[in-house]
Amino acid sequence: MPPHRTHRTRRHPMTLAQRFARFAANLELDTIPAPALDKARACVLNGYGIALGSHPTPFFGVAEHAVLAMDGEREDGATLLGSGRRSTVAGAALANAALFHGRAQEDTCGVAHFGAILLPLLTALVERGEGRIEDFLPALVAGYEVGGALEAAYSPLTTAAGLRASPLYGTVAAAAAAARLWRLPEDRTAAALANAASFAGGILQSFGDGTDEWRYQVGMAGRNGLAAATLAASGSVSAAGAFEGRSGFVRAFVRTECDVDAIAGQLGKDWSILKVTFKPYPVCALNQTPVRASLALREQLGGQADAVRAVRIHLNPTVVGYAGMDKEGPFESVSGTLMSIQFCVATTLLHGAPTIAHMTAFDDAGVLGLIPRIRPLADPALGLLSCRIEADVDGRAEPVVVQMHTDHTEYSYDRAGVSALVRRIGEETGVAPSAYDHIEKFAQALPHADLGDVLAAFGTIQTAR
């Protein structure tokens, strides 16, 4: 491994890759604020808990089949958590991410789902002995912070251009996490991030078409981030200006100049992981508040959704413009229904809190009949997670109005809240309570946890499959 290089005699300002690397490589448990560590443990619990509850979904099986075809089965490999078979670390990162992403209830940082990328990767690496469990939390936080800094700065522009934040910024996050887990020195960490900037991408069209590519993008981000870090550890010569250079990440994907100081200056001050949100319902993160508002409206209507003549739902323009959100159907997959504002609102008004069963009822006559009466409207005065519903109802002279000015704090649960959420999902999907006992023990014990608890938890769903 190349020797550590100091920056004391550097003539030019540090690049963004170098500043990210300095931050990530020097992250330690005692330099991460206690609230950020607590939130990281909540993210761990949520990630594993949602993956357990995703065992009935088909996406892991597809990814596992592909992994075994590409990488083969390895007796001494990393566990494919949905089946108990073993393959390469890269293979486990891909297959297991499809399980973590199976219900679409993974955590969200802005509009990116870093947990479904980072946790499968770090789990596989630690299981294979390619990293210490004591470095698990700092590596996880490094991924959230580096990926989150880019997402916060640029996702409104890249999302509008049709690029999905999770693979675009998650590939860089995964490289940061792997580099920190391996304790790569700053110069090799910078190389890992530069490599990841070259390997990142991912489009949103699958949401518009209601197809499944997005289910596998998170695993590919982990796999590509792993490759980026492995190449760096092996001595790759990588572009220092990978992010802000003339043909770098920011100009290529965002079509703007990169403000290195503005992005790097927030590291260690404005912690991205503290803004991570969790999803109470199996719908897109941007549909969580519309569902909550619809539940409130349903209560006011006494469950009589058939009396609704028209619904106007005002949302942030990013929400309305996001691929697949403003869509009336037809629907042939849950990838389409969980994104559609109209479907989510209609099924909630008719049936209450949505379940996977509700989201897969593509021919529900009541829902399909209500959808044409629901109209999403862009309102720049509303935040990303806020909404206002106005419903015209038979027998009422004035519209029934529900308004929710919500931000990330509404969905930023502590571990107790996460535990209640994932156990509720387990009841819905038939997961043994002991599985959640195991992952709670693991999250609580970090940084001195036993990964055997995680493997034991997933052993319960392997038997079920």
Regions found by a protein language model. Give the residues of each.
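Well-ordered alpha-helical scaffold segments within catalytic/enzyme domains
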Residues: S54, L122-G129, A175-L181, A228-A232, ...
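Flexible glycine/proline-rich, aromatic-decorated loop/lid segments
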Residues: N195-I203
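Well-ordered alpha-helical segments within folded domains of soluble proteins
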Residues: G115-T123, G170-A177, R223-A227, N287-V291, ...
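Terminal-appendage/accessory-domain detector
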Residues: R10-V111, E213-R223, T230-R465
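Short, Lys/Arg-enriched N-terminal segments with co-localized hydrophobic residues
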Residues: M1-P13
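Structural helix-adjacent loops and short alpha-helical linkers that scaffold large soluble proteins
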Residues: R128-L140, R183-A190, S238-G241, G302, ...
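Aromatic-lined, polymer-binding surfaces characteristic
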Residues: V146-V172, A178, V218
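Hydrophobic alpha-helical hairpins/lids featuring a short glycine-rich hinge
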Residues: A97-A152
